[in-house]
């Protein structure tokens, strides 16, 4: 199948023969929802992808659950975002600055990436402060409550990668699938 927007699909490369429409659940899941996954489920995913021993995220999954309960932001989606943005907690900025989300690591000068005192601090800051602009309808960065795509959601302003939202959604699905689909369509 072929698609120009990630949800309208065609059977031919010229995109003349319509096949159907599909919306990825995790790509459009509002961040103001609560995940049913536990810290163990998140850690199991990290172990399963081979980063249980070399990731700064390892042993810190509870930070995402605690911040979800404190700020009302979906722990699964933020964990998936951290996995994508930090190469599962193994990137240079993750390991040297506890920056799991690429804050201030702009394309033109990634070395201005923010530093945090630790993973809990980074997660707290991300879920409690940084995402607020994307979730606040009065903020200029607000284009929807989900990771979305370049048409709506965080992906409009958060990342230059056109497929950023679907990449995070794919990781979220993989995490949830390994945990027994505790969140899908709930």
Protein language model features and the residues they cover:
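Catalytic cores of secreted/periplasmic lytic hydrolases that degrade extracellular macromolecules
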Residues: 1-77, 88-186
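C-type cytochrome heme c attachment motif
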Residues: 80
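Pyridoxal 5′-phosphate
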Residues: 85
């Amino acid at each position: 199948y072929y698609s120009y927007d990630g949800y309208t699909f065609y059977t031919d490369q010229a995109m003349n023969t319509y096949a159907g429409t599909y919306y990825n659940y995790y790509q459009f899941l509002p961040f103001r929802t609560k995940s049913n996954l536990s810290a163990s489920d998140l850690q199991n995913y990290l172990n399963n992808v081979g980063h249980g021993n070399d990731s700064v995220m390892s042993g810190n999954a509870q930070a995402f659950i605690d911040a979800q309960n404190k700020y009302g932001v979906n722990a699964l989606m933020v964990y998936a975002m951290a996995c994508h943005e930090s190469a599962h907690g193994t990137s240079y900025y993750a390991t040297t600055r506890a920056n799991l989300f690429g804050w201030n690591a702009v394309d033109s000068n990634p070395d201005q990436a923010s530093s945090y005192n630790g993973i809990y601090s980074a997660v707290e800051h991300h879920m409690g402060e940084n995402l607020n602009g994307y979730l606040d309808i009065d903020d200029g960065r607000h284009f929807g409550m989900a990771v979305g795509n370049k048409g709506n959601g965080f992906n409009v302003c958060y990342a230059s990668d056109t497929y950023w939202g679907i990449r995070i959604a794919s990781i979220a699905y993989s995490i949830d699938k390994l945990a027994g689909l505790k969140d899908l369509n709930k």
